[in-house]
């Protein structure tokens, strides 16, 4: 008796959970379809997540750099056994970007602001390379190869493979 009553309650609970009940005249499936996002909304959320991740990475790297540069300076009057010569280095300030970069989504920002430090390209014709120098070297190599293959010297040499025989090609380069 107790078992049948418990079984009925459980089966009724399973029935209610598995059956989609209409709400305000629409089925539950219709409501869930309304929650699907548009492509632009997905892109917006993706860009927002990416900018947040970039901001976190920037903060993390800044904290790392601050931790590296806080070493104590030891005041020693001793001369080190192997003194190193002073290197010609310049100390540039470390900067990872503007402070307001993380506030805006990438679609909202002006892309040209990110690349301020790059020099502007001068529009005009490209300078042509001097004709002849590289091409002449290629021509010489081709002539040497064709002369070497046509002469038949590679068959009488110690090595049987013309690819591995460097002595003949070196000889031809010296002759030309």
Swiss-Prot record:
Residues 26-37 form a propeptide. Residues 123-133 have a biased composition (Basic residues). GO terms for cellular component: cytoplasm; extracellular region; nucleus. The keyword Nucleus applies. A motif (Nuclear localization signal) lies at residues 109-130. Keywords: Calcium, Cleavage on pair of basic residues, Cytoplasm, Hormone, Nucleus, Secreted, Signal. Its main location: secreted. InterPro entries: PTH-rel (IPR003626), PTH/PTH-rel (IPR001415). The keyword Calcium applies. Residues 1-25 form the signal peptide. One of its GO terms (biological process) is regulation of growth plate cartilage chondrocyte proliferation. PROSITE patterns: PARATHYROID. GO terms for molecular function: hormone activity; peptide hormone receptor binding. Residues 77-91, 106-116 have a biased composition (Polar residues). Residues 76-157 are annotated as: Disordered. It is found in: Secreted; Cytoplasm; Nucleus. Belongs to the parathyroid hormone family. Neuroendocrine peptide which is a critical regulator of cellular and organ growth, development, migration, differentiation and survival and of epithelial calcium ion transport. Acts by binding to its receptor, PTH1R, activating G protein-coupled receptor signaling. Regulates endochondral bone development and epithelial-mesenchymal interactions during the formation of the mammary glands and teeth. Required for skeletal homeostasis. This is Parathyroid hormone-related protein.
